[in-house]
C-alpha cells in the first residue's frame, strides 16, 4: 500500500471528504487528490498532522513516505534499477 492509498483509505473510513481533510492539513483539495493518487508526495511535516488527525502512529506514515521516496529514486533513475537488481542478488 502506498502513502496516498493509506491516506485515502483512512479518510474514506471516517467519511471525510477530500476538501475537509485538505482544509485540516492546510493544503488544496487538488493537491490532496494528487497525493492520494500517487502523483505527488506530501512534505514530511504533514505526516505529523495526518498522524494526529487519524490517531495513527507517526511511524506508519513515515514508513510509507520513505518507501515512496525510495521507489521514486529507483524507478526514475537508470542506476536505481541496477542497484535494485544488485540488492536482490545479494539477498539470495
Regions picked out by a protein language model, each given a short descriptive name:
Residues 1, 12-13, 41:
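Short amphipathic helical patch at the helix-1/turn junction of helix-turn-helix
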Residues 7, 21-22, 32-35, 61:
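Conserved hydrophobic/aromatic packing and binding residues within compact polymer-binding modules
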Residues 26-41:
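Recognition helix of helix-turn-helix/homeodomain-like DNA-binding domains
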Residues 39-52:
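Short, basic-rich loop-to-helix N-cap that marks the start of a DNA-contacting helix
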Amino acid at each position: 500500500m502506498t502513502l496516498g492509498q493509506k491516506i485515502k483509505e483512512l479518510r474514506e473510513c471516517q467519511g471525510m471528504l477530500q476538501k475537509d481533510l485538505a482544509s485540516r492539513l492546510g493544503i488544496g483539495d487538488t493537491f490532496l487528490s494528487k497525493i492520494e493518487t500517487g502523483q505527488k508526495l506530501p512534505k514530511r511535516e504533514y505526516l505529523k498532522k495526518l498522524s494526529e488527525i487519524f490517531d495513527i502512529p507517526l511511524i506508519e506514515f513515515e514508513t510509507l513516505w520513505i518507501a515512496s521516496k525510495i521507489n521514486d529514486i529507483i524507478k526514475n533513475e537508470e542506476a536505481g534499477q541496477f542497484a535494485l537488481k544488485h540488492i536482490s542478488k545479494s539477498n539470495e
